Amino acid sequence: MAVAKTPGSVGLISLGCAKNRVDSEILLGELARRGHAITPDMKGAETVIVNTCAFIDEAKRESIDAILEVAARKGKGVGKLLVAGCMVNRFGQELARDIPEIDGFISLDSLLEVETIVNLGGAAPPPSPSHMVFDHTAPRLLTTRGYAYLKVAEGCNNPCTFCAIPLWRGRFRSRTIASLVDEARQLEEQGVGELCL
């Protein structure tokens, strides 16, 4: 009888805003649900995911620096480097071209496909805005104690000249009140005493 292989350990570096933190928690929740060991020790992780921010130049630089830092550890403990988040939706193809050490890309719309991407890798998507809105049924592994972010909406409809959020987070779309109430109750059951909107 063959013994099932235990999925490898995964570490995640989360950069950027509270929406990115929720996206990171969904990534971790889906991986944990699929049996992956989640580790805070990036040096000991078989796979490292960098969840990027692309809002301002400083955030882009911080994201690139984190990607390059993990890329330098490939073969020295880190087996795979995956990149997620806003930079993937906006600059995924450039990242694939300029940083060949990246093994796969997780767009904002493919968060729940993370296990497949961990196992098989994934090509950089063409630049495109997100269309998904995750609800209370998405698995979530909390990274904070006592409080949690409740993502009530996604995207933006304002075409401000100084901001590109609609280009990768997509047009504004709200979650239903029922979904928000269900998630708030789930978070309370997990010991969360404060919700940040």
Predicted regions, residues:
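Proteins enriched for Cys/Gly/acidic motifs involved in redox and nucleic-acid/cofactor modification
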Residues: 1-196
